């Protein structure tokens, strides 16, 4: 019998657990503070195959130490800040570890110690990071083995409501706290595009959207706005590419065409992305969003004045962004904006959110952005029976001695209505598969690593196919 210790019971845990409990010779101990989540993710499973422990893992991890030496592998799905603490216990008891998170500096520092203990600390086993890196390295390694060199890499990834559920001005919904999404929306981006080092300031990132079309297996074209994602330069080294060969290195995020970028820019324009504590939010008896906007913008509290003030503030900000964007002379394709049309979309979005209504009360979270998050969490949540979709696409240009090819690797995965979301499936299932490989003794690498070598990515990607999570690969020669 193989024993697995699973820490955490969030939305990713169920697909990982479901995968592992398909094995008759696996026993899983699941630990979480939340008994309702433990009951939910284990519902329907044979009670002889698992054990649940209700415990505050974040503060009482030491109480679980006895389970580490008894386990063939530990899965950490608790907050990433605790992974290194879990890893130290794994090293102490010579037990392997799987996480879905990026390799932190604290985790990386444990690599030599883990090697000496004969322990594998395998990270980045989700979608992004995870499937994205594995599918990229599969193409890159295959190209190198056949004498090719990668000159261009463009990768897009998005987790979105499926088209029939994208029924709001954002074209987006949240299945967990919006704070992380909003925070990342205001980060700058750096990348290499056709030999040009592009630096996109945080404030104009959502004004430099690229038009992206991804075709599904039925030939249906899905239209997106693409936005650059943080710093793409480190991936030249991470993917073992020759910097002298690479002219384009870009990683970006997908949103449905038309809405999200407009709404983000408009909310920034009126000051709702501020992270400063604002005492006006804490007024006794509460404050409406309308009243708060009136105070933020300094206008009269009547419909015509407020509407004019909102429209003019957003328009002025959009024009400012366009001027700044045009002055930077970027070299990548950018969707031209109709400012008047975008302003009207934003205003209708404000009305839909209730920002112009005296009836929509602010849930005070001390800062404008956190109070906005509370509103978005209420308005942009998934309803019963709705599903999400994950879209991942890599585009490579590979030069061979006698030809140049465009190679595309793409994944479209839909969530299950009233079941696991596509996001949770594409994170939890890879975690489960990696755990199975380790527990079955099919890995030899030790230390702190991601799944970017054939030892990991080949079997994991192959097993994902049987779970209906498959990267479809195509190639086409580029005629000169």
Curated annotation (Swiss-Prot):
Keywords recorded for this protein, A-Z: Amino-acid biosynthesis, Lysine biosynthesis, NADP, Oxidoreductase
Induction: Down-regulated by phagocytic stimuli.
GO CC term, one of those recorded: cytoplasm
Phylogenetic placement of the source organism: Eukaryota, Amoebozoa, Evosea, Eumycetozoa, Dictyostelia
Catalytic activity: L-saccharopine + NADP(+) + H2O = (S)-2-amino-6-oxohexanoate + L-glutamate + NADPH + H(+)
GO biological process: lysine biosynthetic process via aminoadipic acid
Family statement drawn from the similarity comment of this UniProt entry: Belongs to the saccharopine dehydrogenase family.
Protein name: Probable saccharopine dehydrogenase [NADP(+), L-glutamate-forming]
EC number: 1.5.1.10
Pathway(s) this gene product operates in, as recorded in its UniProt entry: Amino-acid biosynthesis; L-lysine biosynthesis via AAA pathway; L-lysine from L-alpha-aminoadipate (fungal route): step 2/3
GO molecular function, one term: saccharopine dehydrogenase activity
Top-level enzyme category: oxidoreductase
Protein's organism: Dictyostelium discoideum (Social amoeba)
Pfam families: Sacchrp_dh_C, Sacchrp_dh_NADP
């Amino acid at each position: 019998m193989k024993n697995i210790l699973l820490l955490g019971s969030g939305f990713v845990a169920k697909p990982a657990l479901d995968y592992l409990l398909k094995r008759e010779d696996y026993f899983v101990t699941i630990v979480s503070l939340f008994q309702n989540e433990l009951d939910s993710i284990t519902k329907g499973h044979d009670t002889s195959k698992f054990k649940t422990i209700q415990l505050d893992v974040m503060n009482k991890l030491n109480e679980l130490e006895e389970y580490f030496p008894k386990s063939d592998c530990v899965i950490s799905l608790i907050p990433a800040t605790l992974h290194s603490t879990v890893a130290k216990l794994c090293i102490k008891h010579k037990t392997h570890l799987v996480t879905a998170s990026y390799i932190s500096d604290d985790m990386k520092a444990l690599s030599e110690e883990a090697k000496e203990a004969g322990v594998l600390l395998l990270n980045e086993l989700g979608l992004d990071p995870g499937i994205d890196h594995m599918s990229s390295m599969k193409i890159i390694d295959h190209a190198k083995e056949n004498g090719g060199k990668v000159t261009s890499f463009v990768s897009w990834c998005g987790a979105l409501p499926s088209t029939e559920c994208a029924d709001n001005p954002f074209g987006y919904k949240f299945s967990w706290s919006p704070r992380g999404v909003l925070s990342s929306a205001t980060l700058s981006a750096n990348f290499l595009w056709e030999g040009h080092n592009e630096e996109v300031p945080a404030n104009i990132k959502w004004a430099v959207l690229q038009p992206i079309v991804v075709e599904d297996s039925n030939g249906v074209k899905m239209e997106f706005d693409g936005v650059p994602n943080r710093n793409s330069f480190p991936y030249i080294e991470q993917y073992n590419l020759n910097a002298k060969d690479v002219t384009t290195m870009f990683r970006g995020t997908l949103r449905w065409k038309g809405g999200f970028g407009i709404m983000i820019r408009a909310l920034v324009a009126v000051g709702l992305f501020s992270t400063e504590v604002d005492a006006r939010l804490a007024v006794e008896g509460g404050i409406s969003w309308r009243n708060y906007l009136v105070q933020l913008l300094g206008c009269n509290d009547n419909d015509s004045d407020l509407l004019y003030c909102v429209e003019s503030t957003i328009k002025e900000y959009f024009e400012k962004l366009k001027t700044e964007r045009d002055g930077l002379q970027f070299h990548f394709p950018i969707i031209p904006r109709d400012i008047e049309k975008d302003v009207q979309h934003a205003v209708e979005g404000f009305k839909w959110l209730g920002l112009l209504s005296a009836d929509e009360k602010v849930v005070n979270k001390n800062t404008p952005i956190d109070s906005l998050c509370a509103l978005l969490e209420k308005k942009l949540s998934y309803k019963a029976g709705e599903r999400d979709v994950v879209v991942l696409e890599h585009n490579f240009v590979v030069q061979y001695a006698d030809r140049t090819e465009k190679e595309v690797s793409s994944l479209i995965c839909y969530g299950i209505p009233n079941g696991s979301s596509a996001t949770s499936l594409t994170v939890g299932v890879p975690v489960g598969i990696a755990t199975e490989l380790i527990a079955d003794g099919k890995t030899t690498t030790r230390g702190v690593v991601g799944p970017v070598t054939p030892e990991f990515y080949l079997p994991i990607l192959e097993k994902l196919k049987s779970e209906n999570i498959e990267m479809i690969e195509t190639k086409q020669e580029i005629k000169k």
